[in-house]
Amino acid sequence: MGGMATREPWSEIHRRLSARDEDRLSATDLDALADALFWLDRPLESAEMWHRAYLAHMERDERAEATMAAWRAFYEHLQIGERAVASGWLARMRDLAADAPGSLEAGYVALAEASWAHVGGDAEMALGPCREAVATGSERDDPNLTALAIETQGRLLIELGEVAQGLGLLDAAMLSVLGEDLDPLFEGWIYCELLSTCRGLADLERASEWTRAAMRWCDTLAEGRVYAGICRVHQVELDCLHGDWSRAEEGITRACADLLAVDPRYAGEAHYVAGELHRLRGEYDAAESAYRRAHELGRDPQPGLALLRLAGGQAASALAALRESSVCREGPPIHRARSLAALVAAELQGGSPERAHAAMGSLSQVTDDNESSYLRAIEAHCQGSVLAAEDRPEEAVTALRTARRLFTELGMPREIAEVGLLLGQLGQRAGDIDGARLELEAARATFARLGAAPSLATADLLLAGTAADRHGLSERELEVLDLVARGRTDREIAAELVISAHTVARHVSNIRTKLGVSTRAAATGYAYTHGLLHD
């Protein structure tokens, strides 16, 4: 096994061996043909060819080689969802390994045992054979087995709650990829598994670093689009977060086409990410199509589809989808956090701050259970939104400044600008027109550069609001003043705005102070004179 630099192209191997009569193909030829079919993105044919290679090796009593052919057939069938067939191959491997305890092949079989236990939902049971595979790979000086088994052990530990230890093992596996001459099968395997794990944990700093390495490796692939397509989806998502939407558009178009053409099982995530980019740009029809295609390909379209409904003013539809979807309760931390953040936004838009507060509690639990700056930033942003809706501006500003600091450290311009929008609104409510304008103009500039049309329109609308002379009154104070002018008592105003009578009294006092009047009647007269009342 070795790197790809001196390897004959897979298409040439396939052409050369396919041209021969079947009875002239050796067992080794069948191995090479099966491998070529894998790299040419033909998994079903590859699985069948590994079966033929296994039989050829067994006919020659080449038990070690037969075990490895069975190992490849096992994973091919496992990946395409044929678990019953995969189970049969595992049984054959067990029989062969029983005759060669401690052999290198037995180590590969142990890794297959770990994978089988893991897909069966028992990560703890998978640890034992995985550690056996690590030990065998080290003892037999096989870097491929050692690196893949270490990476698998890291993922298992993360799933079992030992995140720091698991991440350390993932980093160790990646160093093997970068520093040792691994077979490309194992390089691509480790890259894809590691990137998926880091993304799921919302460890975006680590994901960014390893994604760059993965894409450099993908650039060396002359053939085989599955590994490159999967890695490219991760790169596109990071490009979206870091504000390079032009590169993201180019990358996701290519990823969708490549994955759909060669292995649709992996194309669902690509179409979902495409939907996210379209939604953020305000290309709502294209976003809808992408989310629906993702769903057809087996990817839950939430929370993106719910956020699309929310952007269209359909809060009830968004709430129904998010409350019913399992993404708020299950799956990797990043999926749950994003879904709960969407639920918070939908509850607020739907006029249910109490429910939004409850969703915040669930989001905080996800954040507390995971060390992630990105999750903490999402939590702080949502917390600021909820506090603003609860008319607790000082606490809201504190939370939003925390969110902005974290998003800034992560290099996420759109998220920074979204926080700026809310800070600008809070500034408007407090009568800090200059401060509000600074926030809103900065946010607007970012949205214009990115091409985030919906957020740009919101910024323009809010900036128009700062231009109107509201005499220093906040939105809530204007609402209270309008009701005072209609003759409502503090208790009646409190009931209508769903706030306490004490809060109403505080607003009335602030109104009198800002307008320079001493009575409710004088405030009413001032409001009529200066056009501060609703039509």
Question: What is each stretch, according to the model?
Answer:
Residues 1-73, 89, 97, 380, ...:
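Repeat-based scaffolding regions
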Residues 348-351, 357, 364-401:
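Alpha-helical adaptor scaffolds
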Residues 2-3, 28-41, 67-83, 105-122, ...:
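Tandem amphipathic alpha-helical repeat scaffolds
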Residues 373, 385, 389, 393-395, ...:
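Linker/hinge segments immediately adjacent to helix-turn-helix/homeobox DNA-binding domains
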Residues 14-21, 51-61, 90-101, 131-142, ...:
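Amphipathic alpha-helical segments of tetratricopeptide repeats
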Residues 6-10, 43, 63, 83, ...:
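TPR-repeat structural position
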Residues 389, 398, 464-518, 522-535:
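Helix-turn-helix DNA-binding segment
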